C-alpha cells in the first residue's frame, strides 16, 4: 500500500515546497528588483518619516485638506468584541459596506453626505465618488471632478486662490492607464502633501 501512496506523498511535498515556498520567495525577490517602491508598499515619506502609502487612503477631515471617498471599513467594538464600530480606512479590515442600493441606512447616509457637500458648494453637482464607498473601503484616489468640487472650501480655509488650487489638482491628476484602463484620478495624500508644501 505504501508503494501506491508514495508517489502522491512525494508530489504533495514537492508541490508544497514549489508553490508554497520557492515561487513566493522568487516572486518577492523579483518584485524587489524590478519594482522596489511598489514591493515595499508604495510608502510615502516626509522628512525621513513614513506618513502613508500611495495605495491606501487616509481619513482627512479638516477643511484645509482635500477629502477622499467615504470608507465603510470597521473595527471591533472595544466594549463588545462581538460588534463592530466604524473605523475609516482600517487596512486590517478592508471591505465595503455590503449594503444594497435599496438599504435605508445606505440611502440615509448618502443623502446626509450629499446635503453636507451641497452646503459646502451649492452651485456644483456633487461628484458620486464623494458620497459612495469603494469596494475595499481603502481607495486612495478620487476623480479630478471630486477634487475640483472641494477647491472653494480648501481655498477659503487656506487663504489660497482657487486658480492656484485648480492648477495643483491638474498637476496631480493621472490619466487612464495606457489611455484605456481605469478612470482619471487624483491621489488624495499626494495632493494634500503638495498643498502643505504650497506657499
From Swiss-Prot:
Record key words, sorted: ATP-binding, Cell inner membrane, Cell membrane, Ion transport, Membrane, Nucleotide-binding, Potassium, Potassium transport, Transmembrane, Transmembrane helix, Transport
Recorded GO CC terms: plasma membrane
Annotated Pfam families: KdpC
Superkingdom: Bacteria
Transmembrane segments: 7-27
Membrane topology: Single-pass membrane protein
Gene Ontology molecular function terms on file: ATP binding; P-type potassium transmembrane transporter activity
Polar residues biased stretches: 71-84
Record InterPro entries: KdpC (IPR003820)
Subcellular location: Cell inner membrane
Sequence segments annotated as region (Disordered): 67-86
Principal subcellular localization: membrane
Family: Belongs to the KdpC family.
Quaternary data: The system is composed of three essential subunits: KdpA, KdpB and KdpC.
Job description of the protein: Part of the high-affinity ATP-driven potassium transport (or Kdp) system, which catalyzes the hydrolysis of ATP coupled with the electrogenic transport of potassium into the cytoplasm. This subunit acts as a catalytic chaperone that increases the ATP-binding affinity of the ATP-hydrolyzing subunit KdpB by the formation of a transient KdpB/KdpC/ATP ternary complex.
The name this protein goes by in its record: Potassium-transporting ATPase KdpC subunit
The species this protein was found in: Rhodopseudomonas palustris (strain BisB18)
Gene: kdpC
Amino acid at each position: 500500500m505504501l508503494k501506491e501512496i508514495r508517489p502522491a506523498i512525494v508530489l504533495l511535498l514537492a508541490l508544497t515546497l514549489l508553490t508554497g515556498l520557492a515561487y513566493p520567495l522568487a516572486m518577492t525577490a523579483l518584485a524587489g528588483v524590478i519594482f522596489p517602491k511598489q514591493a515595499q508598499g508604495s510608502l510615502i515619506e516626509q522628512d525621513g518619516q513614513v506618513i502613508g502609502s500611495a495605495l491606501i487612503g487616509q481619513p482627512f477631515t479638516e477643511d484645509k485638506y482635500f477629502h477622499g471617498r467615504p470608507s465603510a471599513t470597521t473595527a471591533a467594538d472595544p466594549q463588545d468584541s462581538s460588534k463592530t464600530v466604524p473605523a475609516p480606512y482600517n487596512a486590517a479590515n478592508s471591505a465595503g459596506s455590503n449594503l444594497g442600493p435599496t438599504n435605508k441606512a445606505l440611502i440615509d447616509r448618502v443623502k446626509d453626505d450629499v446635503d453636507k457637500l451641497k452646503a459646502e458648494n451649492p452651485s456644483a453637482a456633487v461628484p458620486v465618488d464623494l458620497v459612495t464607498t469603494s469596494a475595499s473601503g481603502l481607495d486612495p484616489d478620487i476623480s479630478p471632478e471630486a477634487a475640483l468640487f472641494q477647491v472653494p472650501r480648501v481655498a477659503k480655509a487656506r487663504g489660497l486662490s482657487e486658480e492656484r488650487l485648480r492648477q495643483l489638482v491638474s498637476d496631480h491628476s493621472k490619466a487612464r492607464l495606457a489611455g484605456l484602463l481605469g478612470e482619471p484620478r487624483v491621489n488624495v495624500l499626494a495632493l494634500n502633501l503638495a498643498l502643505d508644501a504650497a506657499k
